[in-house]
Amino acid sequence: KLLKDMYVQPGLKGTLDIWDMQMVEYGRRIIEKRKRFVEELNEIIQNIHFNLTGGTENLRVIYEPSCPGQELEKTVSENRERDMRMKITSAGPHRDDLCMEVNGIDIRRYGSQGQQRTAALSLKLSEIYIVKRTIKDTPVLLLDDVLSELDSSRQTYLLDSIHDIQTM
């Protein structure tokens, strides 16, 4: 918003260094926390997905930061002029992404619809596990006709996995 407002209020340009410093400081923290979270998530999701697919698929979540945390300050500085022209901030944790690979293949691009749905379900089950462990309470799981999209072995695994979770 600041980059857009600078053209209406030129005095705001003088505050850009302060905002960039804060974005870099907090951005580095966010990037590090996301890295740790994805590592933890992978430990859980790989087991869930392996069981859900009957051992035929290995799922891995890959955190793709727009730039490494240690390079964030340099990248923000190098991109400043272009970012001011474009009125966007092109680097930082708001530009990060997650990739999901099944057996080493990026399923965003090359996965079947079934693989994508199964990976999404594995992600949901992993989230439930992490939330349950973190807050020491069982979350509610909302599923919309998911069983019709799964074969019988995946249905059985899903139902066994969520038997103690309130579902809607």
List where the protein language model places each region:
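Phosphate/Mg2+-binding loops and adjacent switch elements
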Residues: 1-10
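Short, intrinsically disordered, charge-balanced linker/junction segments flanking boundaries
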Residues: 4, 166-168
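Conserved NTPase motor "head" modules and their coupling/switch loops across ABC/AAA+ ATPases, GTPases
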Residues: 9-140, 149-153, 157-160, 164-166
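Walker B catalytic acidic pair
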Residues: 144-146
